[in-house]
Design a protein with these regions (language model features):
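Amphipathic terminal alpha-helices
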Residues: 284, 292-311
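Substrate-binding strand-loop-helix patch
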Residues: 189-196, 216-236, 245-253, 292
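Conserved beta-loop-beta element that borders a ligand/cofactor-binding pocket
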Residues: 102, 134-159
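Substrate-positioning beta->alpha
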Residues: 162-169, 183-206, 213-217
């Protein structure tokens, strides 16, 4: 089988590395701290923004999966160097570069998001993410690398913990039958991308030549409001109805005084105050991976949280 490099070991990086290892590939995971080896997975401690170091790690690999991101409040400062390093490593080794992206680059839109929308975001985080793909796409168009970006909405599912909007702040509480608070309008339709589908799309796109040179949306189930998702999770858990409340702006304002992460959320509040819907039909009509049925997502998520200590 082949060698794959996965940059980052958050929810998406871990899911991608384990999927590849399960398929029999050899996987090298790059993080700053490293970890103990796992079956089929070698963990390497390195700064992925160091292009010479990353190039050495990627020698012999067929693909580099970019699943890492700088700290949320440092995107504008640190994304350019990380993107440049990934591009340089792909060029030096011939590995396909698969970038895990998101939907920030589009900015606020009034329709379901498709890949042909312009990257028109004006905020610093949206511009930073748009610039990553613009930088990588230029290298691809110049014939220097082979690259693809796979864009996901907010992660949901087994393995999604602190960084998810329907994760550690919500699921353990609803499993106890307690009320939950969510960011923005709890009744606004919102697309939630299932984490196993993210990993499956990254792996599939790496090996599909027809995918390269453009961006694709990860197959994503039909949009559901936060209230609908909480209701589905509670029904699966058998806890009975759970109250869903909007986090008061005053609470967010006070918390932002002490938390850089919460402070940075102001730029993307539009994603939760209005419909935020992704159209993934282009990917699903071209490739084998399709969105996992929502009922299956809900069952697996409740089971995972219970297995990992939630009631």
């Amino acid at each position: 089988m082949s060698i794959h490099v996965v940059i980052g070991y958050g929810p998406a990086g871990a899911a991608t590395a384990r999927l590849l290892a399960g398929q029999g590939h050899s996987v090298r995971v790059v993080t700053r701290s490293g970890r103990r080896p796992e079956p089929g997975i070698e963990h390497v401690a390195a700064d992925a923004a160091d292009s010479a170091r990353l190039t050495g790690i990627a020698r012999g690999a067929v693909a580099i999966h970019g699943c890492a991101a700088p700290p949320y409040h440092r995107w504008a400062a640190q994304w350019p160097q990380l993107a440049a390093s990934m591009g340089a490593a792909a060029e030096a080794t011939g590995a396909v570069l698969v970038v895990l992206g998101n939907l920030y680059g589009y900015g606020p839109v009034d329709r379901p998001m498709t890949e042909d929308l312009p990257l028109a975001a004006t905020g610093p985080k949206g511009r930073a993410r748009a610039a990553v793909w613009e930088q990588v796409r230029t290298l691809h168009e110049e014939g220097r690398i082979r690259a693809v970006e796979v864009r996901a909405s907010d992660f949901f599912g087994p393995g999604v913990t602190d960084g998810g909007h329907l994760a550690s702040r919500v699921v353990p509480r609803l499993l106890r039958g307690r009320s939950v608070s969510v960011l923005g309008d709890p009744d606004a339709p919102h697309s939630w991308t299932y984490l196993p589908d993210v990993a499956a799309a990254l792996v599939e796109a790496a090996g599909a030549e027809q995918a390269w040179g453009r961006a694709w949306h990860v197959p994503t189930a039909p949009a559901q409001s936060a209230r609908q998702m909480v209701g589905r999770l509670a029904a699966e858990a058998g806890t009975g109805p759970v109250a869903v409340r909007r986090t008061p702006p005053a609470v967010l304002g006070a918390a932002s005084l002490f938390s850089p992460l919460i402070r940075e959320l102001r730029e993307i509040r539009y994603q939760f105050d209005r419909p935020f819907v992704v159209d993934s039909s282009a990917y699903e009509s071209a490739f084998a991976v399709h969105a996992t049925p929502l009922d299956e997502q809900i069952r697996a998520t409740v089971a995972w949280w219970r297995e990992h200590g939630a009631p």
